[in-house]
Amino acid sequence: MKKMVFLFPVCVLIFLECRDSRELTAENPKAILGHYLFFEKRISFNHSKSCASCHSPEYAFTDGYRKSVSADGNNLLHNAPSILNIAQNHFFDWDNPEIHTLSQQIKRPLYNKHPTELGMDLDSSSLLSFFKKDSLYSSLFERAYRGENEMYSAKHVEECIIEYVKNLNSRNSKFDQHLDSKAVRLNKSEEEGMRLFFSTELKCSQCHAPPDFTKSNTSNMVDSAYANIGLYNIANENKYPAEDVGLNKITKKLRDDGKFKIPSLRNVMLTAPYMHDGSVRNLDELLNIYSAGGQSINKGPLSGDGRKHRNKHPHIKGFEISDSQKKNLICFLSSLTDTTYLSNPYFLNPFRNK
């Protein structure tokens, strides 16, 4: 087996500033209002879904489904990504590199009709009237928009949800504590897994870069933040499924077929299933795909050898990994788990005790 060179980038020591969310909301009435709106089912067209339906605290603000379910009961195209730590991202969408801000991103889940997600009506007089008449919401809107002529508007709903989401920061994992003070030590298995993660052989960190183990907030270059990992190669014709081709949908360039946003690995133990389409059930399956240099499917409509897709990222070459090494790597990934946010009311459903 080749000797692995352990590379630990300096940037892993540089963490984004993170203040306690309780402190932030105390001085940010829009975030307080946004907290309630995020968990409010009335913002969906039939009052069946909220933002939290697809981004639940229990699953690190994902939903546990292969593909999320819309307010009208249909499966959406993609797996719900975590929205923890996304305020500094340059990219937000699985396959649309033109979405650079939360203000742009929020419009699709709120208003889209084809397909419907929440299906909120931009001019929903009944929803805005409810906010105005409800004692809780009228008080919260008054605090957030006192003095404005039009307190109750779809624009303000967007703005407050964004303020809430911007403060959903989770960087208190065992790994973070180990780096921060050295008072918490990684165990032998976690340390060996970290060595593998940053090695030149596996190259995990080349795409999943600290501090948040993604390129979405460390690079504003599309080719750095999006990649084809050799998941599909329909009929060996260098194609992904026609309904979900990746960046090619927007750019109309064949070289972008199969490229999707590289997700964060923070809390990855809580966010299964994996990939843009939720097709990978667990980390063991995922590592098998990477170690093989992509996925080969032998039968069915998706059959083809993703390992040979012409757009596959050059780092996805495959590697040898033993069962014990795989276990160690998963132990390291587990050290990126932070559930301390579950003790912070700001992250939880404010209606849970009502």
Language model regions located:
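Short, compositionally biased low-complexity segments
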Residues: 100-115, 128-139, 300-306
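Short glycine/threonine-rich turn/loop motifs
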Residues: 19-108, 176-289, 295-302, 344-354
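Amphipathic, soluble alpha/beta structural segments
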Residues: 124-143, 231-234, 254, 292-299
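Short, polar/flexible loop-turn hinges at active-site or ligand-entry regions and domain interfaces
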Residues: 90-94, 113-118
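Extracellular low-complexity, Gly/Ser/Thr-rich intrinsically disordered linkers
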Residues: 277-340
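Post-cleavage N-terminal segment of exported redox proteins
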Residues: 1-35, 108-110, 122-191, 195-199, ...
